[in-house]
Amino acid sequence: MVRDCTDDEATPSYKTDDGRPVPHVTGEKRPDVRANRHAKKVEVTVYGWKLWVVWEPQMKMPLALAIDDIQVHDNQHAYEVLAQAQQNVAGIARIRSVALDRGFLDGKLLSRIEKDGILIYIPAKANMRVAQDAREIARRAWEEGQRGRSLEGCVVRERHEKVRHGSGKKATTEILTTTLVGVRELGCDWWNEDGSNSKENSKSYEPKLLNATVVLRWDGAPKEAEHEVVILTTNPAQDPFEAFDGYDDRSLIENTCNREAKEQWFLEHHPKRSEAGVRVHAYFVFMCMALVVGFRVHRSNSDRARLRGQETGIARYRRELRTNNWDKVMVFTEEHFGIFRNYEFALLGGLSVLRNERKGESLAVVLERYGVPAQRADSS
């Protein structure tokens, strides 16, 4: 599972529910200049609201949504929207893991999610002590591996993927290598129910032990020193690619959810320039995205059934409906009605049905089935 936030931008002229100014946030942002990705950042003010989305990356389905002002911190509704997603899939599925971005690096929040039995994949910030320790240990493990030795508590793994470029005689094949180092039981002092506080300096304080995956090389491109990606996880698996693949799914929410919602579903094209219009439109867009996924799954199952020779479509549904209800009768009395099997109606009418009586069906059994006491039935 993936959880992320995205802005639903508006303008200062929008009408809010309580008459207050449109929510806004001011910060530095790099202009969208593709020819110069290192353009100088400028101060901008963005108006609108923020959406919290829980996304299932394999089926590409939104599971929960929350909306609040754009200046609200990402952590504000992070747990609530995840809890809502768990309720929405209760009885059908279970959320086993969640991938988050650096905006959710909060010890209290992560500890609360972990208590629910959900595995967490989240990258550490470059200046964090836990990230610096993980990089240092990973480099030593890699150097020891080059000498044919191993470093205790570390696992070095590589994955090679062939990528074909071009076609025909000019086609070339490139091998992309991803190198990971898994570091087990790395101390993290801020990952607890209280977050970062003075208890960390206590002699009796025991930091949270996490597994970390350090990405030394990603698809053939080596990471710069001191800037290697460090993925923190509560997954006890020894293979570092478990955490790598789990976090890699987070990129799907940017393209298959946020971008598609804005570009293909016109998320920011609000039908009314008001807060209510923004909220209604957001829920409607993500509801439609979920319905489309459900329809595609239904069509896929129907196509496979048709290839096996099974009948599909409305004709089959009507036949099944007729088969399941051919021996039922509906009885009306004033403003009440009841649906009975034919033999039940006959028994209630004082008739005998030998075929069902041999199976143990009697008037008393029918009355008990519908919660009518036998004495009350005799008196009536």
Locate the predicted segments by residue.
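An anionic, glycine-rich sequence signature occurring as long contiguous blocks
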Residues: 116-252
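A short, flexible helix-boundary coil/loop motif
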Residues: 141-199, 263-280, 284-380
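Short, conserved catalytic/metal-binding motifs centered on acidic residues
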Residues: 1-9, 53, 60, 78, ...
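A short alpha/beta connector and helix-capping loop motif
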Residues: 16-25, 107-125
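A C-terminal functional module that forms or caps the active site or interfaces directly
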Residues: 229-235, 240-282
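Active-site beta-loop-alpha junctions of metal-dependent nucleic acid enzymes
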Residues: 66-91
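A short acidic (Asp/Glu
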Residues: 12-14, 106-113, 130-136
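Active-site-proximal, Lys/Arg-enriched surface segment
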Residues: 1-54, 58, 368-379
